[in-house]
Curated annotation (Swiss-Prot):
The protein's name: Vacuolar protein sorting-associated protein 54
Keyword Chaperone: no
Species whose genome carries this gene: Homo sapiens (Human)
Source taxonomy: Eukaryota, Metazoa, Chordata, Craniata, Vertebrata
Role noted for this protein: Acts as a component of the GARP complex that is involved in retrograde transport from early and late endosomes to the trans-Golgi network (TGN). The GARP complex is required for the maintenance of the cycling of mannose 6-phosphate receptors between the TGN and endosomes, this cycling is necessary for proper lysosomal sorting of acid hydrolases such as CTSD. Within the GARP complex, required to tether the complex to the TGN. Not involved in endocytic recycling.
Biological processes per GO annotation: apoptotic DNA fragmentation; astrocyte differentiation; cellular response to progesterone stimulus; gene expression; Golgi to vacuole transport; homeostasis of number of cells within a tissue; in utero embryonic development; intracellular calcium ion homeostasis
Record keywords: Coiled coil, Golgi apparatus, Membrane, Phosphoprotein, Protein transport, Transport
GO MF annotation, one: syntaxin binding
Comp. bias (Polar residues): 535-552
Residues that bear Phosphoserine: S8
Subcellular location: Golgi apparatus, trans-Golgi network; Membrane
Main location: Golgi
Quaternary data: Component of the Golgi-associated retrograde protein (GARP) complex, also called VFT (VPS fifty-three) complex, composed of VPS51, VPS52, VPS53 and VPS54. EIPR1 interacts with GARP complex and mediates its recruitment to the trans-Golgi network. Interacts with VPS51 in an EIPR1-independent manner.
Length: 977
């Protein structure tokens, strides 16, 4: 056996137990062999640890590791031999919560016992006995195994002589430590008369390495020889396996051929006999039913005659009657299958003809001239078609009508565009071929008239669709009402017939009468039940021709169902409606109710179609940005026209469509974006070219501000004559206050009013306009801060320096905008819905930002004077003459500051600014006096300082508007302690 040639060094001993083997510990059979002395002394400077503990494939294979069970914590804790004294292993340290818990076995695994192996033991025991007997008969194999074990032990002992460093996986002589360990050249020193000993050591080292090489080569050759027999055995087994497969394939092929012959001889003949017998039986049945076939033979020609006169309902009734006879009297006859399928195909053909007829009617109704005043085209034809389709349960005719609506809506727009383009002389249709390109060449008034015409045609189109769908809806409701009445009559009839014990026969006769011919529905209304039975038997004959539908006008039509319909039907031809309703429609109340809902949804869909086509028309015109380039008045006119059309369609169809409204909102957003970007760009250009000098105020801007004071936020109309005579003013007067401003701020106020007026004209963009206006005001604040406080104007417009006058003028402009922010907020608040009042917080943030900017400008003015005081007073000396040159310069600079800002800032702000400047002055003077050790002692120095301070105070209070300013100069002296 192949297993006998295994290279395992562990022999398998037999045991009395058949299924378990005892593994022999190889360590008990290994005879220790002394190894050769190591002639590679270790360098004291090398890594001795790495040399001594290097792994060995031979000696390390029996070493204990952390994976053994005795040092594995889970194995130790799960040891079944756990002593009772060890049960408190965890609880004695960590508490009673840590206790041994029994692991519940998985309920997915079955409980295995020895009984499960009983059958296997019985089957394998005989084989095991034979195997043991064969092992005893072949003792040389055991000898071979012992020899193999002895050889393996000897090989392992030889390999132990090779140092572990040669077994390391990272062994490389280019490593200095490894090289010195293998070839210790430090011991081979020829100096000092030791040459002979070193030569002997070198020779011994060479012999030792050669010995190691021989050991390794011998072991490699031995391993190859051990596995050669297994390799040749595997190849032999492969050839045998291929032979077995080839023989098996031939056997399978032969077996299949035999089975095919058996099937042909024993099965096919019997089956053929059975088929012949079945055919004979069918022929007998056909012969017995030939006369019955003649009774229905005339059905198809009669149907063809009815179809030639478009009597779809009569043809369907005849087909239904014939199928009913086949199912009741000729049921189970296989030879009549072709007749049923032909009738079904004929019925399907009638269905297709009715659908085609309805499609033709829909096309004619929807595409007739819109100037025609007739709401419904051929109402009788429509009612007849709808009843026929309902009878056949072809409820998808509404989808056909919907498709025709889509096509008609496209044609309406196309025809309107063609008519408008043909009326426009500026468009050369020979040069511009595409209709869409021709439409884009229309200017706004022409395009607006075209859109108005399209909306008008769509309104008429929806009115016609609504009238047609109302007729269909009334037919569906009449059928639903008829079903309910029929159900009530059936219940009453069943109660009466139950008393006579012939309810079943009467009901069958009634059903046959109701479903045979058209004339039975209205010409035999007053017949007694006996007459009904007679009529039903007469109609069962195929030779009876169906009565013409002209009998509608007969006065004998007085059945219960028809008379009730005469009072409920809203059709212009009540008789025609009654004929259809009296038929069995085979529709449940839920289906009819769903169909009625679908009709209403189709009306909604018609509105959506018109809106969708209008949206596509708008989008095709908006491709080149035409709608975004409209001015405010043009866009307002367009939006009002679209809103009117939306309201008209909602009134006609009963539901508001959102597509056109969404397109209007989308265009409004684009309009707002363009509106905002244009004005923001304009403001940016104005700021970049602003030199921050006081500008004259034209009269029209003063009128604009005056109108705001009156509570009217709107751009006033220009008065050409009066404007030319009035001269510009130096300042802008707002509610009695004078504002010296730059030209950019005047235009900014006008831009703000344009935003407010746009909100009045287009209320739907109020929130967007509020956001854009907030962005514009923030942009003005930040950009003006960059240009003035950040000195950006020096590079942008080439100013030499940012003067105090520039700063004061910027502050006054910001104050003017802050003055109007509450007015703007109130304007937007009146037009915002209450849910969006939170957006007004933007104005609060803007007001805070503007106030912070104004405060920064004031702080900048104070900082300018503060640096001046620090520069002048640091050189101040208390000596004659009085007033000193330092105080003269200070007063001169204060006068310049006052002259620069007094005409720009209000008097109250000027006073507050100079109070802050004076506080800075006192702080620096106090610091300098403390440095000079000048105190308020009434001495000569104190007198000189007092004279200078008096000069400063007099000059400061002499300035305009600062006479009553409380300077409190006593704070310059240190307080006595």
């Amino acid at each position: 056996m192949a297993s006998s040639h295994s290279s395992s060094p562990v022999p398998q001993g037999s045991s009395s137990d058949v299924f378990f083997k005892i593994e022999v510990d190889p360590s008990k059979h290994i005879r220790p062999v002394p190894s050769l002395p190591d002639v590679c002394p270790k360098e004291p400077t090398g890594d001795s640890h790495s040399l001594y503990v290097a792994p060995s494939l031979v000696t390390d294979q029996h070493r204990w590791t952390v994976y053994h069970s005795k040092v594995n914590l889970p194995a130790a804790l799960n040891d079944p031999r756990l002593a009772k004294r060890e049960s408190d292993f965890f609880t004695k340290t960590w508490g009673l919560d840590f206790v041994d818990t029994e692991v519940i076995p998985s309920f997915y695994l079955p409980q295995i016992s020895k009984e499960h192996f009983t059958v296997y033991q019985q089957e394998i025991s005989q084989r095991e006995k034979i195997h043991e007997r064969c092992k005893n008969i072949c003792p040389p194999k055991d000898t071979f195994e012992r020899t193999l074990l002895h050889t393996h032990d000897k090989s392992r002992t030889d390999l132990e002589q090779v140092p572990k460093i040669f077994m390391k996986p990272d062994f490389a002589l280019d490593d200095s430590l490894t090289f010195n360990s293998v070839l210790p050249w430090s011991h081979f020193n020829t100096a000092g008369g030791k040459g002979n000993r070193d030569a002997a050591s070198s020779k011994l080292l060479q012999e030792k390495l050669s010995h190691y090489l021989d050991i390794v080569e011998v072991n490699i050759a031995h391993q190859i020889s051990l596995r050669s027999e297994a390799f040749f055995h595997a190849m032999t087994s492969q050839h045998e396996l291929q032979d077995y497969l080839r023989k098996t394939s031939q056997a399978v092929k032969m077996l299949r051929d035999k089975i095919a012959q058996i099937d042909k001889v024993m099965c096919e003949g019997s089956l053929h006999i059975l088929r012949l017998a079945l055919t004979r039986n069918n022929c007998v049945k056909v012969y017995n039913k030939l006369k019955l076939m003649a009774t229905v033979h005339q059905t198809q020609p009669t149907v063809q005659v009815l179809l030639s006169t478009s009597e779809f309902v009569g043809a369907l009734d005849l087909i239904a009657t014939t199928q009913e006879v086949l199912q009741q009297e000729l049921q189970g006859i296989h030879s009549f299958r072709h007749l049923g399928s032909q009738l079904c195909e004929l019925e399907k053909l009638i269905d297709k003809m009715m659908i085609a007829e309805f499609s033709t009617y829909s096309h004619s109704d929807l595409n007739r001239p819109l100037e025609d005043d007739c709401q419904v085209l051929e109402e009788e034809r429509l009612i007849s078609l709808v009843f026929g389709l309902l009878k056949q349960r072809k409820l998808n005719f509404l989808e056909i009508y919907g498709e025709k609506m889509v096509i008609t809506a496209k044609n309406i727009i196309k025809q309107c565009v063609i008519n408008k383009v043909s009326q426009t002389e500026e468009i050369d249709t020979d040069v511009v071929v595409k209709l869409a390109d021709q439409m884009r060449m229309l200017n706004f008034p022409q395009w607006f008239d075209l859109l108005k015409d399209i909306f008008s045609k769509f309104t008429i189109f929806l009115q016609r669709v609504k009238a047609t769908l109302n007729i269909i809806h009334s037919v569906v409701l009449s059928v639903l009402d008829k079903n309910q009445r029929t159900r009530e009559l059936e219940e009453i009839s069943q109660q009466k017939n139950a008393a006579k014990d012939n309810s079943l026969d009467t009901e069958v006769a009634y059903l046959i009468h109701e479903g045979m011919f058209i004339s039975d529905a209205f010409g035999e209304g007053e017949l007694t039940p006996i007459a009904v039975d007679t009529t039903s038997q007469r109609n069962a004959s195929p030779n009876s021709e169906p009565c013409s539908s002209d009998s509608v006008s007969e006065p004998e039509c007085t059945t219960d169902s028809s008379s009730s319909k005469e009072h409920t039907s809203s059709s212009a031809i009540p008789g025609g409606v009654d004929i259809m309703v009296s038929e069995d429609m085979k529709l449940t109340d839920s289906e009819l109710g769903k169909l009625a809902n679908n009709i209403q949804e189709l009306l909604y869909s018609a509105s959506d179609i018109c809106h969708d086509r209008a949206v596509k028309f708008l989008m095709s015109r908006a491709k080149d940005g035409f709608l975004e380039k409209l001015n405010s008045m043009e866009f307002i006119t367009l939006s009002r026209l679209m809103e009117t059309f939306i309201l008209d369609t909602e009134q006609i169809c009963g539901r508001k469509s959102t597509s056109l409204l969404g397109a209007l909102q989308s265009q409004a957003i684009k309009f707002v974006n363009r509106f905002h970007e244009e004005r923001k760009t304009k403001l940016s250009l104005l700021l970049d070219n602003e030199r921050w000098k006081q500008a004259d105020v034209p009269a029209e801007f003063q009128d604009l501000v005056d109108s705001l004071s009156d509570g009217k936020i709107a751009l006033p109309e220009k008065k050409s004559g009066a404007t030319e005579e009035r001269k510009p003013a130096e300042v802008l007067i707002v509610e009695g206050q004078q504002y010296a401003v730059v030209g950019t701020v005047l235009l900014l106020i006008r831009i703000i009013l344009e935003y407010c007026q746009c909100v009045d004209n287009i209320p739907s963009v109020t929130t967007d306009m509020l956001t854009r206006l907030s962005d514009l005001l923030k942009y003005f604040n930040s950009r003006s801060c960059q240009l003035v406080l950040g000195a950006g104007a020096l590079q942008v417009v080439g100013l030499k320096t940012i003067t105090t006058k520039n700063l004061a003028l910027s502050s006054r402009c910001l104050q003017l905008i802050v003055h109007y922010i509450p007015v703007i907020r109130a304007h937007f608040e009146a037009r915002l819905p209450p849910k969006q009042y939170s957006m007004l917080r933007h104005f609060d943030h803007i007001t805070k930002d503007y106030h912070d900017h104004i405060a920064e400008i004031s702080a900048k003015l104070v900082a300018i004077m503060d640096s001046l005081f620090d520069k002048l007073l640091s050189k101040y000396e208390v000596k004659a003459p009085v007033p000193s040159a330092c105080f003269r310069n200070i007063c001169k600079q204060m006068t310049k500051m006052h002259e620069a800002i007094f005409d720009l800032l209000p008097e109250e702000q000027t006073q507050m600014l100079f109070l802050r400047i004076n506080a800075s002055y006192k702080l620096h003077l106090k610091k300098q006096l403390s440095h000079l050790n000048v105190i308020n002692d009434g001495g000569p120095q104190n007198g000189l300082v007092t004279a200078d301070v008096a000069f400063y105070t007099g000059n400061l209070q002499a300035l305009k508007g600062l006479k009553d300013l409380d300077l409190n100069m006593a704070e310059i002296w240190e307080q006595k302690r």
